[in-house]
């Protein structure tokens, strides 16, 4: 386009002037170039901004997905730690069960040995009936210890009931926590579904934006192609206008030359007409003179002939001289006839040249009329081209207005979508924070409840075993009392063995309680350690 403008300018400078149509076309081409460059820069900036916005959204989505993956990995690690802790707790429970089995085996061995001793002492008691008072005092002491042991067993039973109530309350609390955890898990599942739906909607919106961007790019390409087509059409119109102007100039030059030729021919025609008129007048004068001369000569000849005849008769001797005069007259007549023929040939030639000049004049006038008609047609085509250029300008302005309106609509839609995405990002972040806090609290409470439940179950199992042992011991003591009351003379070694056995059982029960307390403390420490690890991981 610039090359075309430069060519027009150079041709205008070489010609010395620019026509109004060329100036308008040049100004139109400059305006079109400026508009195209401006719109192209605007479209490139807008497309670049849209691409950067889409890249930012893609990066944010990738960051959110990476955070979700990290959270899923942390949850998996926590599940593994919980499974490992459950395995360790199960192993510890198995160890404690094995120890309880060992204790029960020892108790069974002691019972068997006690029964053997009881049988032996009964045999000895049947053979010996001494020191009844000491035995009775020993029995009273043993009964007091048995009462103390019963009181302790009652206290243990009360403590067992308290522990059982605590375990039932903890079990109810665990059930409530389990229900709460199910509710929270359902809420978390709903929130995850909401997050997934939000992600899907954001992805669909991003796809919608990308499709809109592609459509905008397609429209931009279509507009650029339309502008290129219009530019090509304008160039073609410029070329046709230039060719028309060149043809118009050539025809104007031909018209000028033909007008000059016509003027020259008209002058020549005038000259020929004048010369023809002069020659015609000269010929007419010559003809008149010749006619007069011929008439005069004829009259003279008649008179001379008459005279000669008259004189012939009179003067026959003068006959030779009359014959010469007659010859002279005849020669003059021949000369006049030849000159007349020459003049007639010249007149015919001049008439033919006049007819040829008139035909050339007619042809030139016809050519002038045709050229005038062609000039009128060229002016009509030029007006049509100007109207087409105006229409193209209007089309370009309409396309620009429609594109600007569509671009404004796209900008408003993109701003609304960005605001909605920002709000959704805020809601997603708050939901993630609240869900992570609830997950932490729920996991901590569930761990505490599980640990307490395990501890209380173990304590209850141990207390149940102690209660069974106390029952067995109380039954054995009752049997001993019955045996002692039935016997009239108890033996002191039996009381010593019973007191020793009761002291050993009391020590063993204290030892079991201490071990239970140590185990409870150890479980508490482990639960605190796991809670600290979990909080550190979170």
From Swiss-Prot:
GO molecular function: molecular adaptor activity
Keywords: Acetylation, Cell cycle, Cell division, Coiled coil, Cytoplasm, Cytoskeleton, DNA damage, Mitosis, Ubl conjugation
Record-listed N-acetylmethionine modification sites: 1
Cited Pfam families: CEP63
GO CC terms, sorted: centriolar satellite; centriole; centrosome; cytoplasm; spindle pole
GO biological process entries: cell division; centriole replication; centrosome duplication; de novo centriole assembly involved in multi-ciliated epithelial cell differentiation; DNA damage checkpoint signaling; intrinsic apoptotic signaling pathway by p53 class mediator; meiotic telomere clustering; negative regulation of innate immune response
Localization per record: Cytoplasm, Cytoskeleton, Microtubule organizing center, Centrosome; Cytoplasm, Cytoskeleton, Microtubule organizing center, Centrosome, Centriole; Cytoplasm, Cytoskeleton, Microtubule organizing center, Centrosome, Centriolar satellite
Entry keyword annotation includes DNA damage: yes
Post-translational modification summary for this protein: Polyubiquitinated via 'Lys-48'-linked ubiquitin, leading to its degradation. Deubiquitinated by USP36, promoting its stabilization.
Coiled-coil segments on the chain, per record: 73-283, 343-486
Domain of life from the UniProt record: Eukaryota
Keyword Magnesium listed: no
Subunit description: Interacts with CEP152 and CDK1; these interactions recruit both ligands to centrosomes. Interacts with CDK2, CDK5RAP2, WDR62, CEP90, KIAA0753/moonraker and CCDC14. CEP63, CDK5RAP2, CEP152, WDR62 are proposed to form a stepwise assembled complex at the centrosome forming a ring near parental centrioles. Interacts with CCDC57; the interaction is required for their location to proximal end of centrioles. Interacts with FXR1; promoting its stabilization.
Stated family: Belongs to the CEP63 family.
Function: Required for normal spindle assembly. Plays a key role in mother-centriole-dependent centriole duplication; the function seems also to involve CEP152, CDK5RAP2 and WDR62 through a stepwise assembled complex at the centrosome that recruits CDK2 required for centriole duplication. Reported to be required for centrosomal recruitment of CEP152; however, this function has been questioned. Also recruits CDK1 to centrosomes. Plays a role in DNA damage response.
Name of the protein in its database record: Centrosomal protein of 63 kDa
């Amino acid at each position: 386009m610039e090359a075309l403008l430069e060519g027009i300018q150079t041709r205008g400078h070489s010609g010395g002037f620019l026509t109004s149509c060329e100036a308008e076309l040049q100004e139109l081409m400059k305006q079109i170039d400026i508009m195209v460059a401006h719109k192209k820069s605007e479209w490139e900036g807008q497309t670049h901004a849209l691409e950067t916005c889409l890249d930012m959204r893609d990066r944010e989505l990738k960051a959110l997905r990476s955070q979700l993956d990290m959270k899923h990995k942390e949850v998996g690690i926590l599940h593994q730690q919980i499974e490992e802790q459950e395995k360790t707790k199960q192993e510890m429970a198995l160890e404690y069960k094995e120890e309880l089995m060992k204790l029960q085996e020892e108790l069974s061995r002691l019972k068997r040995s006690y029964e053997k001793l009881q049988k032996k002492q009964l045999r000895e008691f049947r053979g010996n009936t001494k020191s009844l008072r000491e035995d009775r005092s020993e029995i009273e002491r043993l009964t007091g210890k048995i009462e103390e042991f019963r009181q302790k067993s009652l206290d243990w039973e009360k403590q067992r009931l308290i522990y059982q109530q605590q375990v039932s309350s903890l079990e109810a609390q665990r059930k409530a926590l389990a229900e709460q955890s199910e509710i929270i898990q359902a809420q978390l599942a709903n929130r995850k579904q909401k997050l997934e739906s939000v992600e899907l909607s954001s992805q669909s919106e991003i796809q919608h934006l990308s499709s809109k961007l592609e459509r905008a790019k397609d429209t931009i390409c279509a507009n650029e192609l339309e502008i290129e087509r219009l530019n090509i059409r304008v160039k073609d119109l410029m070329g046709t206008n230039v060719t028309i102007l060149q043809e118009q100039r050539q025809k104007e030059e031909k018209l000028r030359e033909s007008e000059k030729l016509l003027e020259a021919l008209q002058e020549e025609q005038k000259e020929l007409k004048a010369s023809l008129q002069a020659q015609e007048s000269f010929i007419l004068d010559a003809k008149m003179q010749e006619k007069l001369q011929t008439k005069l000569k004829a009259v003279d000849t008649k008179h001379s002939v008459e005279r000669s005849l008259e004189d012939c008769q009179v003067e026959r001797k003068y006959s030779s001289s009359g014959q010469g005069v007659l010859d002279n007259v005849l020669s003059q007549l021949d000369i006049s006839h030849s000159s007349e023929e020459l003049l007639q040939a010249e007149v015919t030639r001049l008439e033919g040249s006049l007819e040829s000049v008139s035909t050339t004049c007619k042809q030139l006038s016809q050519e002038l009329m045709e050229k005038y008609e062609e000039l009128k047609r060229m002016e009509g085509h030029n007006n049509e081209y100007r109207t087409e250029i105006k229409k193209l300008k209007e089309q370009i302005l309409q396309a620009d207005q429609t594109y600007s309106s569509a671009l404004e609509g796209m900008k408003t839609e993109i701003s609304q979508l960005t605001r909605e995405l920002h709000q959704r990002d805020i809601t997603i972040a708050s939901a993630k924070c609240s869900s992570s806090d609830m997950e932490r609290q729920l996991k901590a409470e569930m761990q505490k409840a599980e640990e307490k439940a395990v501890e209380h179950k173990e304590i209850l199992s141990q207390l149940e075993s102690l209660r069974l042992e106390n029952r067995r011991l109380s039954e054995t003591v009752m049997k001993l009392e019955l045996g002692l009351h039935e016997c009239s003379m108890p033996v002191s070694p039996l009381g010593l063995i019973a007191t020793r056995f009761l002291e050993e059982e009391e020590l063993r029960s204290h030892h079991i309680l201490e071990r239970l307390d140590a185990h409870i403390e150890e479980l508490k420490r482990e639960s605190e350690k796991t809670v600290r690890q979990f909080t550190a991981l979170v």
